[in-house]
Amino acid sequence: MSTIIFGVVMFTLIILALVLVILFAKSKLVPTGDITISINGDPEKAIVTQPGGKLLTALAGAGVFVSSACGGGGSCGQCRVKIKSGGGDILPTELDHISKGEAREGERLACQVAVKADMDLELPEEIFGVKKWECTVISNDNKATFIKELKLAIPDGESVPFRAGGYIQIEAPAHHVKYADFDVPEKYRGDWDKFNLFRYESKVDEPIIRAYSMANYPEEFGIIMLNVRIATPPPNNPNVPPGQMSSYIWSLKAGDKCTISGPFGEFFAKDTDAEMVFIGGGAGMAPMRSHIFDQLKRLKSKRKMSYWYGARSKREMFYVEDFDGLAAENDNFVWHCALSDPQPEDNWTGYTGFIHNVLYENYLKDHEAPEDCEYYMCGPPMMNAAVINMLKNLGVEEENILLDDFGG
């Protein structure tokens, strides 16, 4: 009996000793106490926080909202900050978005940096103008088969001081959305029924954040307008979950509340006299509309400009009256739509084919100096790649090719 008791006592003492060792090691290895994050050398911008979390979270907790379209997952590469000291070594997860040269300059992804010690950061001053608003849905209407126009009302007395080409981030709570509950007008239901899309559901167990470019321009006051394409599973792989944020947005009804933050952006027009060529497709319409309206309505620009939009069929064209009106009012602006798959009932007599080919064959091929134009584009990835390849073959420098990756 005494042997058994001795064994139990020794085992207990060993466990207690190991616990003490772990606690001692933790006290030495894991930082405790307050952490100070200095920003831009300005004492008034300094943040005091607790160690252990991510830098992106610490900044957001202090009301400093750094853009992160993926919600902190490390996949979008937007939450770049410059860390002068205290950030530790760069992680492999960051190197997909940050070059070795940028890393030497202190570039990091805030969502991947753990807060372990006092830090010294450099942030763009415009970040401090980013705010968060709870908006109200005005409308959420189909503009094409798979694209809705979400129109949000900003709270009374507030404004979002964005520039044309900018974007906001939408926050979605945990939710369970059934596609069968979507409001899809009869004229668009054919493809939905054909591909049996109403069978899908989207269940999200934690809040998510995604970025969308504005379709309105700064002088359309009091609203935020977005073009949102539903991200359904690909036909050849129907078991892939549908897009979480697009499913949530498509479920919104007039009167619902929706939280956004912003403004963010870098897809801004250059302040030059160069000719502007806009190329869009799908939900890439949004920043194109914002830019063109801003140039012609707010700035009263006299720069030569054209807009080339690609759609599948006439049913997928939208804002036609808007652009027709702008073309009628402004001698320096023309716009063209090309259909890649016009239907018999369309009675289409305009351009057909993919928009990069149409743009080249009907304009740039005979342009006296295509390399001198500025090209602004937003659309599906394949369209973007085709347009960029075509422009580079024409000798257009990268500095004159401006791309918004959020569309399509």
Swiss-Prot record:
What SUPFAM superfamilies does this protein's entry cite? 2Fe-2S ferredoxin-like (SSF54292), Ferredoxin reductase-like, C-terminal NADP-linked domain (SSF52343), Riboflavin synthase domain-like (SSF63380)
Hey, what's the signal peptide range on this chain?
Answer: none
Q: Please give the annotated consequence of changing residue 210 to L.
A: Decreases flavin content, but does not affect the 2Fe-2S center. Exhibits very low NADH:quinone oxidoreductase activity
- E.C. code: 7.2.1.1
Gene Ontology terms, cellular component aspect? plasma membrane
Q: Which cofactor does it need?
A: [2Fe-2S] cluster; FAD
Result when mutating residue 79 to A: Loss of the 2Fe-2S center, but does not affect flavin content. Exhibits very low NADH:quinone oxidoreductase activity
* Entry's cofactor comment: Binds 1 [2Fe-2S] cluster.
Instruction: Tell me where on the tree of life, at the top rank, the source sits.
Output: Bacteria
The answer to whether the entry has keyword Flavoprotein is yes
Task: Kindly give the InterPro entries that the UniProt entry links to this protein.
Answer: 2Fe-2S_ferredoxin-like_sf (IPR036010), 2Fe-2S_ferredoxin-type (IPR001041), Beta-grasp_dom_sf (IPR012675), Cbr1-like_FAD-bd_dom (IPR008333), FAD-bd_FR_type (IPR017927), FNR_nucleotide-bd (IPR039261), NqrF (IPR010205), OxRdtase_FAD/NAD-bd (IPR001433)
Alphabetical keyword list: 2Fe-2S, Cell inner membrane, Cell membrane, FAD, Flavoprotein, Ion transport, Iron, Iron-sulfur, Membrane, Metal-binding, NAD, Sodium, Sodium transport, Translocase, Transmembrane, Transmembrane helix, Transport, Ubiquinone
- Domain FAD-binding FR-type, which positions? 130-270
Main function: NQR complex catalyzes the reduction of ubiquinone-1 to ubiquinol by two successive reactions, coupled with the transport of Na(+) ions from the cytoplasm to the periplasm. The first step is catalyzed by NqrF, which accepts electrons from NADH and reduces ubiquinone-1 to ubisemiquinone by a one-electron transfer pathway.
Tell me how this protein assembles.
Composed of six subunits; NqrA, NqrB, NqrC, NqrD, NqrE and NqrF.
Q: In its UniProt entry, what is this protein called?
A: Na(+)-translocating NADH-quinone reductase subunit F
Name the species this protein comes from.
Vibrio cholerae serotype O1 (strain ATCC 39541 / Classical Ogawa 395 / O395)
Gene that encodes it: nqrF
